[in-house]
Amino acid sequence: MDGGGEHSEALKNYYLGKILGVGTFAKVIIAEHKHTRHKVAIKVLNRRQMRAPEMEEKAKREIKILRLFIDLIHPHIIRVYEVIVTPKDIFVVMEYCQNGDLLDYILEKRRLQEDEARRTFQQIISAVEYCHRNKVVHRDLKPENLLLDSKYNVKLADFGLSNVMHDGHFLKTSCGSLNYAAPEVISGKLYAGPEIDVWSCGVILYALLCGAVPFDDDNIPNLFKKIKGGTYILPIYLSDLVRDLISRMLIVDPMKRITIGEIRKHSWFQNRLPRYLAVPPPDMMQQAKMIDEDTLRDVVKLGYDKDHVCESLCNRLQNEETVAYYLLLDNRFRATSGYLGAHYQQPMESASPSTRSYLPGSNDSQGSGLRPYYRVERKWALGLQQSRAPPRAIMIEVLKALKELNVCWKKNGDCYNMKCRWCPGFPRVSDMLLDANHSFVDDCAIKDNGDANSRLPAVIKFEIQLYKTKDDKYLLDMQRVTGPQLLFLEFCAAFLTNLRVL
C-alpha cells in the first residue's frame, strides 16, 4: 500500500492493503491482523492536515466516543478494536464492512420493500437506543454513516459529531447534514440530544421506503422553511402503520415527537422483530467483565499469557492481547450468526404476558438463555414540583425564595435558567431587585478584607432550570455544580420551605 512504510511502526501488527476511501483529513485502508488473520478497516486521520482547532476537536471527540465503545459488544454499532495516537496521525482500527454504506444500497435498490426496510430500521433503532443508554447522542445520523456487513446488517459508524449527554444540560451546536437535521438544530435552539436522533431516524426511514428524503430543496432558505414547517408528502403506497410512525417521528415540536421507547412499542416496529433485538443488551459494566472461555483459549493458543489476557480484559486495557481477543470473539459470532441468528419475537399485542419482552439470562449475555419478565411502566418526574401556573409567575416565586435565602444569581441565557451561588451566613443585600440579575460575575458581592477567618468555608454553586413537560406543566429542577453535597441538600430543604412545597 502507498504510504505503508511511514505507518509501519504504529501498525506493526497489521498487513496493510488497499485504500478503501479518501476524505479531506482521513483515509480508510483495509488491513489484516497478523496474529488472527482477520480483516479490519483502519481509519487514518492526518493530524498535520487538521490545523483548524474545530477539526482537531472533532477528532478528539470521536476518539473519546469510540473508546467508550471499545470493549462493548453491540451487533449494530461498528466495532472498534484499538485507537493508536502518534504525533503525526491517529489510527482507528475497526470492523471491516465489505458492502459499503446504506446510501449506496438505497440508490442501487431505488427503494426498499416494507419488510426489508423494517429489518434495517429495527437494527438502526437498536444501535441508536444503545448509544442513548450510554449517554451518547450521535447527531449525524444519515445513510452514509450506516455501514453494511457481509450479510447486509447495519453497523452505525462515524461518531465524529457525537457528544456525551450530561443530566440537566442541553446541547446547542448545529451538527449533521441539513436534509437529516431536526428543526431545533437548524434553528440554533437548545436540545437535549435523543430527540434530534429520533428526527434523523424518521428521515432515514422515509428514505428507505421512498428512495428520497422528505425535505429537499436546492435553495437552502427554502429547505430550512420546509424542515421548520414539517412540510413533506407521504406516498400513497405506504401502509397506514408506517405512515403513522413516520408522521410521529417528524413532528416539529420535540416535546411532542415520539421517543425511542415509543418507537419500539409501535405496531409496525414490533412486526417480525428478531428476538435478539427484543432483548435489552447487557449492562455496560457487566458486559465489560464477561469473558468468553472459548475465545480466551484461542487467544492463549496464539502465544499470549492467559492471566495477562484476563487481567487486561477486566481492567479494560487496550493492548495486543485485548485486540486479538475481540477480533476472535467477533469473528466467532459472525461465523455462528451469534446475535443475528435469533428467531422472530412475537408482536406485543399478540404475545402472552410471559413472552412479551425479555432480559438476558444470568449465564448468557447473548440472549440464548432468556427469562421472561413483566415490563412495568413507570413515569419519573425529576425536579422539585410540577405546576400549571404561568412560567413567569413560577420564576417570580423562585426569585422571591432566592431573595429570602440571600442567594446571588444571574440569568443564563433566558430568564428560565439561572446560575446561582449561596454562601451560608452571607450578609443580606437589601436592594436586590426581582427583575434584574444579582450578578456575581466580578465577585463584587463577596469582598475579601484580608482576614482569613472572615472567609466562608463553603460556597454552593448551582443551576435552576424551568422545564415544560409533555402534559403542559412546568417542572423546576435544581442541579448542584460545586460545593458540599449535604450542605446543598440543606439549602434545597430551606428553598422548598420558602416555596411552601413542604
Swiss-Prot record:
EC number: 2.7.11.1
Location of Phosphothreonine modifications: T173
Single Gene Ontology MF annotation: ATP binding
Protein's name in the database: Carbon catabolite-derepressing protein kinase
Function statement: Essential for release from glucose repression.
Ranges of residues in domain UBA: 290-330
Chain's gene name: RKIN1
GO cellular component, one term: cytoplasm
